[in-house]
Amino acid sequence: IDFVGQMHRAGVPLLAGTDEMAGFTLQRELELYVQAGISPAEVLKIATWNGAKYSGVLTDRGSIEVGKLADLALVEGDPTTDITALRRMAIVVTQGRSIDPSRVFTELGIRPFVTTAPHWETSLQ
């Protein structure tokens, strides 16, 4: 963990990503970046903007802007100040559809080790 913090302070670009199941281990990786001394807001940039930049797709991904593609995760809390808020997903929006994370877990037979946020009334129409 200390080495990651040292690399970040030295200006080495960091990318977030794992070889495991998407979501679960990535959340933990981002928490470890915060433990390494990187602010939660900067960790979110590493997980989004940096990935798009170094994958060569920054023109249409990596940030929320008009004309860019985006999948969104709405969480309970503010992950720019508390990275563990990423574990409290309320709604995931992908390809213009909203998905309740708890239903995905149930349908896949997964018992989540993350907490879903209280259900909000939502409508994307």
Model-predicted segments: where are they?
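Structured helix-beta-strand junction loops
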Residues: A10-G11, L86-M89
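Short, Lys/Arg- and Gly-enriched loop/turn segments at beta-strand edges
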Residues: P79-A85
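Short amphipathic alpha-helical segments
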Residues: R28-E29, A85-R87, F105
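His/Asp/Glu-enriched, well-ordered alpha-helical/loop segment
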Residues: I1-D78, S98
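Extracellular/periplasmic ectodomains of large secreted or surface enzymes and adhesion receptors
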Residues: G5-H8, I91, Q95-Q125
